[in-house]
Design a protein with these regions (language model features):
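Short, conserved beta-turn/loop elements at beta-strand boundaries and strand-helix junctions
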Residues: 88-93
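Short amphipathic alpha-helical signal-transduction/dimerization elements
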Residues: 146-154
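Hydrophobic/aromatic beta-strand elements that line small-molecule binding cavities or substrate pockets
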Residues: 24, 57, 80-85, 97, ...
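Generic alpha-helical structural signal
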Residues: 27, 143-147
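Hydrophobic ligand-binding cavity/cleft-lining segments
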Residues: 1-53
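Beta-strand/loop substructures that line and gate deep hydrophobic ligand-binding cavities in soluble
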Residues: 94-144
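Short beta-edge strand/loop motif at the mouth of beta-sheet-based domains
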Residues: 21-22, 41-77
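Charge-dense, helix-prone N-terminal extensions
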Residues: 4-6, 17, 57-58, 62, ...
């Protein structure tokens, strides 16, 4: 597989504002990228492959519906879940994100899926982190995940 069609994924943490921004450009249709965000296909790329091994993913894809991911991280089981706040296929998706058992600490993830001349640009903004350390860790995770997403979706 050629990686010449992949624009490097980047994620930048803002520890003062406790938010992060991430972006990747992929030579794929917007609908294809959106589907990778909202289907079981997410298991192949999401949540820092190699560190978080996502094994199950389910969702009730509607505003107010819930999503749930589970797997193994560093030998221990993990669960992440949240609620869909806005769904506008294939342009925008917003959901909360929290660890199961920690609903008092949700962050909010906004995905913007935009066409551009060579394919699709995926911008992510995650806000509401409880600490700068958590924000920095998520930035590393998003960059790794987006690199994997780009590899999978390159024709």
């Amino acid at each position: 597989m050629s990686t010449s069609n992949i624009t490097a994924a980047r994620a930048v943490a803002d520890p003062v504002e406790k938010q992060l921004l991430a972006c990747v450009e992929i030579e794929a249709e917007s609908e294809r990228v959106f589907r990778a965000l909202t289907s079981e296909e997410i298991i192949a790329w999401w949540v820092r492959p190699g560190v978080f091994d996502t094994r199950e993913w389910s969702c009730d894809m509607r505003v107010g519906g819930r999503w749930r991911a589970s797997g193994i991280s560093r030998g221990q089981p993990y669960v992440q879940e949240g609620e869909f706040l806005e769904i506008d296929p294939p342009h925008k998706l917003i959901h909360t994100w929290d660890g199961a058992g920690r609903p008092d600490l949700p962050s909010t993830v906004t995905y913007l899926v935009e066409r551009f001349e060579k394919g699709t640009r995926l911008n992510i903004r995650q806000t509401g982190f409880v600490s700068s350390d958590v924000c920095n860790a998520f930035a590393v995770g998003w960059e790794t995940s987006l690199k994997r997403l780009a590899e999978i979706l390159v024709p």
